């Protein structure tokens, strides 16, 4: 299994719609020329953006967090260019990009250093072979202060690993519960 380069990522995006919308270069400035957190193709990965759709965790219901019986009322939904995450809390978002993962490929997501250096951690489970959809992102604010996330700017990097052997059973074959998700998706069992 080897990590894939920018050439492979570009080819797969352009010929097989692996990433839509796709940016073949690194975007570091907005339309007005202001610096942003970069997104697009990097040497050995792809930096994704989060959309304007956020779910901010709140404890207004004083409930127990249970992944088997998750209460959607534990979130406040917002649509904005900026998301403020309360201290020691978290928020969910989704990528702008839609992914179609090849059957012989596994994708691992890592947070961007710009956010990590501010105490904001991005967590995403691997994108499995033949999974497709928009990725639900989890941002943890590990600081005792409110933290800001910017929509339509880079938030995480996807690394693509291609196996030397095609898997016997893909995520699609298993009927994975998050297959085809397009919005911010809460836990499912």
Curated annotation (Swiss-Prot):
UniProt function note: Catalyzes the deamination of dCTP to dUTP.
One example GO MF annotation: dCTP deaminase activity
Active site: 138 (proton donor/acceptor)
Keyword entries, A-Z: Hydrolase, Nucleotide metabolism, Nucleotide-binding
Name by which UniProt lists this protein: dCTP deaminase
Family to which this protein belongs: Belongs to the dCTP deaminase family.
HAMAP family the UniProt entry points to: dCTP_deaminase (MF_00146)
Annotated InterPro entries: dCTP_deaminase, dUTPase-like_sf, dUTPase_trimeric
Record flagged with keyword Hydrolase: yes
Pathway: Pyrimidine metabolism; dUMP biosynthesis; dUMP from dCTP (dUTP route): step 1/2
PANTHER family: DCTP DEAMINASE (PTHR42680:SF3)
Subunit relationships: Homotrimer.
Taxonomic lineage of the native organism: Bacteria, Pseudomonadati, Pseudomonadota, Gammaproteobacteria, Lysobacterales
Residue numbers binding dCTP: 112-117, 136-138, 157, 171, 181
Top-level enzyme category: hydrolase
Domain of life of the source: Bacteria
Enzyme Commission number(s) of this protein: 3.5.4.13
Catalysed reaction, written as an equation: dCTP + H2O + H(+) = dUTP + NH4(+)
GO biological process: dUMP biosynthetic process; dUTP biosynthetic process; nucleobase-containing small molecule interconversion
């Amino acid at each position: 299994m080897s990590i894939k380069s920018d050439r492979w990522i570009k080819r797969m995006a352009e010929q097989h719609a692996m990433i839509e919308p796709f940016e073949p270069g690194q975007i570091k400035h907005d339309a007005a020329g202001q610096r942003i957190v970069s997104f697009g193709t990097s040497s050995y990965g792809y930096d994704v953006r989060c959309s304007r759709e956020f779910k901010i965790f709140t404890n207004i219901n004083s409930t127990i967090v249970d992944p088997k019986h998750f209460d959607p009322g534990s979130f406040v939904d917002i649509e904005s260019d900026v998301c403020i995450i309360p201290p020691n809390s978290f928020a969910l978002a989704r990528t702008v990009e839609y992914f179609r993962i090849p059957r012989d490929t596994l994708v691992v997501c890592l947070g961007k250093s710009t956010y990590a250096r501010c105490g904001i951690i991005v967590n995403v489970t691997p994108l499995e072979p033949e999974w497709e959809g928009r990725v639900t992102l989890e941002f943890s604010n590990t600081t005792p202060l409110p933290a800001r996330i910017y929509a339509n700017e880079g938030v995480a990097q996807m690394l693509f690993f291609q196996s030397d052997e095609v898997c016997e059973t893909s995520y699609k074959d298993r009927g994975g519960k998050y297959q085809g998700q397009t919005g911010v998706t809460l836990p499912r069992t």
